[in-house]
Amino acid sequence: MIKAKPQDKYLGDILNEGGLTQSVKETINDRYGKAFNTINEIGAVINDFRINAIGGLKSGLDIFEMVVVPSILNNSDTWVQMDNGSINRLEELQNFMFKNLLAVPHSVPTPALRSELGCLSMEERINCRKLSFIYHVKSLGNSALANEIYELQRNFNLPGLVQECRKLISKYELPNIIDENVAMSRIQWKKIVKKTVGEHSGKLLLAKFEQYSKLRDGPLMEDGLSLKPYLKNLKLCEARTMFRIRTLMMPAKFNMKNDPRFASNLWKCDSCQRIDSQSHILWCPFFAPLREGKDVQNDKDLVEYFKKVFDIREKMEKEKIESCMNGSS
């Protein structure tokens, strides 16, 4: 008796008897564990000898782009009928990488991650790959089997890659290379796809920023989707601090409004009794000597200033605790 296999691997993808959607899901599941372990290894490498190297964070991002993304998205230009579960799993993996790089908690506003690192979402990466692949198939000669299938899907609007790419072309308002005779080289097509999808992604991020009070009132609203210069120009530890400053995640009391320890005192600064917001730290009179000779508009000076401020605060808090313990004894 011949037993039927529920799934098998072909050219790196899992083919499942449940259909295209299930095949994509099983393919992602098959690669997820390896990608997850690789991300942890990348984190260990950059936290070891690149922690004090300028551009260390950018190096970690480059490794992710050159190693993890190609492996997890191999053949993704042919993944059709993907469901939201598969897309969300890929987004979670990318967000895990970004959080690992920036050493931030899971509570970080996720739109800020892509905005600062200048990366597309995993779904948008796949969309770009599909749009590039459909150009390639369209350009093949009539004798190619792939072109024959392409023509069948195009002429009869059959479910498949052509139908999905029609929707993507409409979504991103791209030239209709499927149904119209558009004179455009492969390089021109890739450039316009990359530019248009990037602009569309930036607009979506701005809409998501509105859902976070920390982001809609911060500098990220104006800077758009791009790799920020400080990620290349600062040491890894400094770049991580700068990310927290820009996303209002520094441990100022007003950044932790729900903490009962600070709410009971109306989030006042222990040094000047003003509301201890992150912007207040920039002009707090108690820390004025630390600002002498520094330009708080300069990324490096700003990071050094914040580091010294919170070092002093941590020391003062320890002394306060020790004093209370000595008094009670």
How should each PLM-predicted stretch be described?
Residues 8-152:
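Non-catalytic, peripheral interaction segments enriched in hydrophobic/basic residues
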Residues 45, 49, 207-329:
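Family-specific functional microsites
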